[in-house]
Amino acid sequence: MEDLQPINPNTDSPTETGATTIEARFSYFCKGRLTMDDNALEEAMKLFNQSKHLFMTNASALGSGTPEEAEHYWFAFILFSMKRLSKKNDAEDAAKSNENSFKLYQILRVAKLNFVDFFKELPQFIVKTGPILSNLYGSDWETRLQAKELQANFVHLSLLSKYYKRAFKTLFKPSHDNVEGQSAVANSADYISNCHRFGWLLFLALRVHAFSRFKDLVTCTNGLVSILAILIIHIPARFRNFSMSDSSHFVKKDDKVVDLLASLCNMYETSEDELRKTMVRTNIVVEEILKKDPSMASECTNGNLDNIDTDDLTYFQDLLEEQSLSSDLDILEKDYDDAMLLEGELDERLFINDEESLLGSSSLSGGAINMTGTKRKIDSMTSPTKTITSPLSPYKSPSKMISTPVSTAMTTAKWLRTVVSPLSSFPSVDLTRFLQSCDKDVTSDVIKRARIILEAIFPSSGIPDRTVLSNTQTTNLMDNIWAEQRRLEALKLYYRVLHAMCKAESQILHGNNLTSLLTNERFHRCMLACSAELVLATHKTVTMLFPAVLERTGITAFDLSKVIESFIRHEESLPRELRRHLNSLEERLLESMVWEKGSSMYNSLTIARPNLSNEINRLGLLAGPMPSLDAIALQCNMSCGGLPPVPKRDTSPGKSGEIRSPKRVCNEYRSVLVERNSFTSPVKDRLLGIGNLKSKILSPALQSAFASPTRPHPTRGETCAETAVNLFFSKIVKLAAVRINGMVERMQLTQQIRERVYCLFQQILGQRTSLFFNRHIDQIILCCFYGVAKITQLSLTFKEIIFNYRKQPHCKPQVFRAVFVDDRSSSRRGKTGQDHVDIIMFYNEIFIPSVKPLLVELAPSNVPKNPNNQVSETNKKDESGPCPCPGSPKVSSFPSLPDMSPKKVSAVHNVYVSPLRSTKMDALISHGSKSYYACVGESTHAYQSPSKDLTAINNRLNGTRKVRGSLNFDEVDVGLVSDSLVSQSLYLQNGKGPASSSGQELKTE
């Protein structure tokens, strides 16, 4: 299809108002610019008319806020949704639709928008029009829309194209650098440019014809490396930017010839076995599509393969020769055009054309990757839960390439390939011993469950792809091979971490009987989901983005949040990128997903906070029962491989595995593993405590860790549900503290403001918990900032708060543009029937009426309080515990943030240290290794007080300016040498010196 011309801005003035005018502009956009037929126009107009009132309300929030740009955004959203969600009745309609269809890239070109900006603005359209799309296209509209998958695919292709361009530039010279060329090829200025384009088009053909529908980043990178091998073999050697004699880059076989594939694997961190398999597929694509005759590489006589081991290499006659290159490009272009008729909203050739006006140039995240490759600032603080590093992490290999998202993914895949893949696909002997030590042998149950759950996550048959009308046997076979490989990787990782957890539990409890842990259905599903998610994150799979593992295993975000910390803790070799992925995942769970409708957290909350039950039930937030293994197997249309039917679980009260009761759909447990090292400091627990959170978290007996949520805890005087909710709330407050601190630093606010905002957030979580229901915690944080600013008479507008929030690495525009409200209970004036409003309206009409009494209590002493808004005596009593008066100068209510880098600590703040409690020190350091450590509070010398140690350290740090001209090995107390002294001595050695120091002797103090 020919590229469409941009819309004429003079057709209808965008500043004109009125329904008729905007409808006319939309009609012209569809019919005049996109040449839509009448049926498609009618359907598009129907969706436009039903959502028009939402556009009129939110137009100023789209893009830069100009009327014309806002209209174009809305037009693009409407047409994209309509095209993706329209159901074709039969194959004839589908074929006709494909012939006359338009693609997303064509919509954006007409609207003069780019992909990056489109994907950034799309989420708020989805949030606001969700009910309309559900009514028109069914409840599964979001799954069929595949917006997140399309965005991830765009990000992956952006990264891959940059990766390919960088590698091509490294390997081959630009044609104008070839000054010695005598042939027609050398005289062609466009030859290398055409070869570059040929490589990308061949890669796209490989994606279409040879790869499975699971086009993950690792597989695609292997494909690109195979393309580079094809180019090296066939592009004349004079265009190379390297020499085969360079031993630092190439692996030589028998110290004579270069092993090309092994060398490329060494350069680009790919698996040699996988690369050789991919080379076979690439050669088949060249042979079948370009109709080239393959021959043994040893038969090549043009000198291209001199000094290269030709074993297992294929050479194609006249491939990449000047006389045939143009026709080969035409064939690949035609092949891709045919593929675009069947699937795809994105013309992937755009990435090689450098069409920045259509692609966009700013950053965009997709899945677990960011196009810019920059590390999020929040990662420097990691998760709200503590992460323990290990000497084995991160897993690195000596790479000569600069670090990019693609190279990082390949390094992570190498960990999976070298550490996990060699393991057994069955429980180890040690793990089997734990499984057999339960009240009954659960080995077969564990194996059977793992097979069913992983088959559900990685189905052999594959989930039907609406954009693919037919699949060949080859594609189905590749799908099954890919799924089987991922299942095995996840299974081996699951068994490995499960054994580490069992070993740790047995050491704590001094016994191998772990029945409560190993018979808990929800625990195992969470572990399997976590293992599968790490495998998916390693391969960067576009079609299976989080939370796919939650949906396919039948667990909720609240369930998964309980095992993430333990998983990280007990897999010491986990690469840094995967640790970061799990930490980022935990942030997503805590900030919003746990608060969504259907979260099992609400089932626990009804028991832990009975006063919230009515609101939870009224909003319909409770999670449904966790589906049985039989139901999961049936839903995936797969066989259990001859396994016996899964027995029905006992739903009687008090059973550890009960999952049927809606009130107790989540087995609320707190494993010793999760709690043992979390929030154990009494000071932190007092500052982070919510409601009746105890000042010290004790390790519960394993028998009660997985008991019914309503069962009383044996040592804490509270139910297991209360214990789980309190731990969850403590993580929420720690995450909020990190984000509040980031906003305070960005806006340069005082410590008093920071503490008041933090204190207010704590009180809302403990006393106005319902404000978090169906919302994002950042929405509450932003409102807390403005509320505190008003009560303290600080000159800070909501616009300034949002402006600074947009600069935060975790910012999402829909956070302040679409806040959930329930019109059935609110008394909003002029309500529009929306389920989501902007944050200022939420603040004025929902937040303030609920929080005003708490705000009044936070007012400074010089600000008079309104007696009508005094908090009840009960609330005052509750507040005095976890959140002391912010004016108190003795103890700050703001907690110490986790894993802070020394560079993150402001120089204007004093840093204090306190002695390490002997009980904690003994737990961390064994008797035999104490001599290797120096603990604050314990002297490093016999009969010497710790204060003298600190004094000595301070003297050394403060005395660095007193340096010596030469090192004196006879004295013990030798000062440190400054950088300036070293620099000066180097000048003197070179016979050069600053004028001020020329001829002067170095002083020794």
Curated annotation (Swiss-Prot):
This is Retinoblastoma-related protein. It comes from the Eukaryota. Residues 404-605 are annotated as: Domain A. Pfam families: DUF3452, RB_A, RB_B. One of its GO terms (biological process) is regulation of transcription by RNA polymerase II. Residues 723-853 are annotated as: Domain B. GO terms for cellular component: chromatin; nucleus; transcription regulator complex. It is found in: Nucleus. Its main location: nucleus. Keywords: Cell cycle, Nucleus, Repressor, Transcription, Transcription regulation. One of its GO terms (molecular function) is RNA polymerase II transcription regulatory region sequence-specific DNA binding. Residues 863-873 have a biased composition (Polar residues). InterPro entries: Cyclin-like_sf (IPR036915), RB_A (IPR002720), RB_B (IPR002719), RB_fam (IPR028309), RB_N (IPR024599). Belongs to the retinoblastoma protein (RB) family. Residues 863-899 are annotated as: Disordered. Regulator of biological processes that recruits a histone deacetylase to control gene transcription. May play a role in the entry into mitosis, negatively regulating the cell proliferation. Formation of stable complexes with geminiviridae replication-associated proteins may create a cellular environment which favors viral DNA replication. Residues 404-853 are annotated as: Pocket. Residues 606-722 are annotated as: Spacer.
